[in-house]
């Protein structure tokens, strides 16, 4: 029997019998069509999830973190239960809504390696879209990834496959669907969970004035946390890294001036770097409650001259003083306003200065500016910013990077504030103890110090409130700077109430996404049909081996006769 089988095989090869040759080579063809080894098919990328939080009982952002779907681009006709990949340069809010309307399984937005290389019109458009993305709560997981060569290659292959399906015929689409390679996107993390015991830290420090016990107090405040559509990408170099930089440089300068009797003014200076500024100024709110409601001895309870809030000072040729109530003539706030206006006009004539009056709208869920927290507690306060409106998209964008901050503008803001604190505001408490503007601009002043501090803080990781706890590197750096220049430096912490929390943060904000090269599900069905057909033909051939043998003999004889 084996001899006959060998003779049959030899005859098949000599006669080039197509049906049996096909049967013999089908397994090899199927192996070649199969997916490559798993080790060569996987690619890892770090992805950053969109914001997920609750503020005042209102949820924002995405509610899901699990990603395990096949990749497509917006060019595909069907996006349902697919991971829709988009590049920033091609991104639009209409495309984003299209993906959500079609019940996409996930959305991954690919960002360029360097934001500075992106055209400004694209940056501006995306900054305007960010608030709309957060306002529209969705169950679809939304991630951001920084491009690399492998990820771009995956995107281009997926885009080509998606585009070809839209322009091909039905038969071509079916064939392409059955044979094309795809990419399965899978994240490594679990579903997001609420963090109920998160602490928002703030840092306080002070300089004591020269004189009696009832000295007036000037409070200088800046919130340090950043905000954007993705917490891990929110660096906040301008909003509000620039404000914190100016606060620290003012602390350094006044610490030197308060060292000498001649320049030691009769004012207490209280510096406060607040946390949770982007979440309705939670750090400032709790700090005021602790100092005004829960203690009998506090600088905020005694004689507050005014509160100066620093917010977004690192760009542009404009400077705006935001107030809830215009200061009255004869008050220290009015004198500060006039002196600041004079300094800007005389030393920086190219800078546009104005006062912006906006009443506090208690019906809004989120306060516009930080000084409104103080104004609600009847403390005279105002905010200085280069932004004319609190609705400016720059305040809440992942596009706010160090490369976007103008070092010259930051230095000007610092010098403006130094000029504002002249002898009209830091009056001598006794003869010979006057702090004059000449001293503020003297040898101890360092106009470039604010820019250097900004560079130092920018080297830290993202400064979103969800990422900064009491042991974070950024907070340690901030506390170190304040400890060098100020006295009684200490932290304050805010923890949400368990029964009725004002804010709730969620985890799983940073994950690893694996891209696996896969065949579509229909390929398994097609493969099963081919294997079944192959086995069926083989079975019939074996059952009718005698007939097959005689047929091959006749073919062989004809070949020899020819």
From Swiss-Prot:
It comes from Gallus gallus (Chicken). The lineage of its organism: Eukaryota, Metazoa, Chordata, Craniata, Vertebrata. This is BOS complex subunit NCLN. The chain crosses the membrane at residues 522-542. It is a single-pass type I membrane protein. Residues 1-41 form the signal peptide. One of its GO terms (biological process) is regulation of signal transduction. GO terms for molecular function: ribosome binding. Belongs to the nicastrin family. It is found in: Endoplasmic reticulum membrane. One of its GO terms (cellular component) is endoplasmic reticulum membrane. The keyword Nucleotide-binding does not apply.
């Amino acid at each position: 029997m084996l001899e006959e089988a060998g003779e049959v095989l030899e005859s098949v090869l000599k006669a080039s019998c197509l049906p049996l040759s096909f049967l013999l080579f089908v397994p090899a063809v199927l192996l070649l069509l199969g997916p490559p080894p798993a080790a060569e098919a996987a690619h890892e990328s770090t992805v950053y999830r969109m914001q997920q939080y609750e503020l005042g009982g209102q949820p924002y952002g995405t509610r899901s973190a699990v990603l395990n779907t096949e990749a497509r681009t917006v060019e595909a006709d069907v996006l349902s239960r697919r991971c829709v990949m988009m590049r920033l340069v091609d991104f639009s809010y209409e495309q984003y809504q299209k993906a959500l309307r079609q019940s996409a399984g996930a959305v991954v937005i690919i960002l360029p390696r360097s934001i500075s290389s992106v055209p400004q019109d694209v940056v501006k458009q995306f900054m305007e879209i960010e608030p709309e993305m957060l306002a529209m709560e969705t169950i679809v997981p939304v991630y951001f990834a920084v491009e690399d060569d492998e990820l771009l290659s995956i995107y281009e292959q997926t885009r080509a496959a998606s585009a070809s399906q839209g322009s091909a015929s039905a038969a071509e689409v079916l064939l392409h669907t059955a044979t094309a390679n795809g990419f399965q996107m899978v994240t490594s993390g679990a579903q997001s969970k609420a963090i109920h015991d998160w602490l928002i830290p703030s840092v306080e420090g002070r300089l004591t004035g020269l004189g009696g016990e009832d000295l007036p107090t000037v409070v200088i405040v800046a919130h340090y946390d950043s905000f954007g559509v993705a917490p891990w990408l929110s660096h906040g170099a301008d909003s509000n890294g620039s404000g914190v930089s100016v606060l620290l440089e003012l602390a350094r300068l006044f610490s030197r001036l308060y060292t000498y009797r001649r320049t030691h003014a009769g004012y207490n200076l209280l510096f406060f770097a607040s946390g949770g500024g982007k979440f309705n100024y939670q750090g400032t709110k709790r700090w005021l409650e602790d100092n005004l409601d829960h203690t009998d001895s506090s600088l905020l309870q005694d004689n507050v001259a005014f509160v100066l809030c620093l917010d977004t000072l690192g760009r542009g040729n404009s400077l705006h003083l935001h107030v809830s109530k215009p200061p009255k003539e004869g008050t220290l706030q009015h004198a500060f306003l006039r002196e600041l206006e004079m300094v800007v006009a005389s030393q920086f004539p190219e800078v546009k200065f104005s006062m912006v009056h906006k009443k506090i709208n208690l019906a809004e869920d989120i306060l516009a500016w930080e000084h409104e927290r103080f104004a609600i507690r009847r403390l005279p306060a105002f905010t200085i910013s280069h932004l004319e409106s609190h609705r400016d998209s720059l305040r809440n964008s992942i596009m706010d990077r160090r490369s976007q901050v103008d070092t010259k503008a930051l230095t000007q803001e610092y010098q403006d504030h130094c000029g504002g604190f002249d002898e009209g505001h830091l009056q001598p408490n006794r003869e010979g103890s006057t702090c004059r503007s000449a001293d503020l601009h003297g040898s101890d002043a360092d106009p470039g110090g604010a820019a250097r501090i900004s560079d130092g803080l920018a080297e830290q990781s993202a400064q979103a409130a969800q990422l900064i706890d009491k042991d974070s590197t950024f907070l340690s750096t901030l506390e170190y700077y304040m400890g060098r220049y100020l006295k009684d430096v200490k932290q304050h912490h805010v923890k949400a109430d368990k029964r009725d929390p004002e804010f709730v943060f969620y985890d799983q904000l940073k994950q690893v996404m694996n891209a696996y090269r896969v065949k579509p599900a229909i390929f398994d069905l097609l493969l099963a049909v081919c294997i079944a057909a192959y086995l069926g033909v083989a079975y019939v051939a074996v059952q009718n081996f005698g007939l097959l043998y005689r047929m091959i003999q006749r073919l062989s004889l004809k070949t020899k006769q020819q």
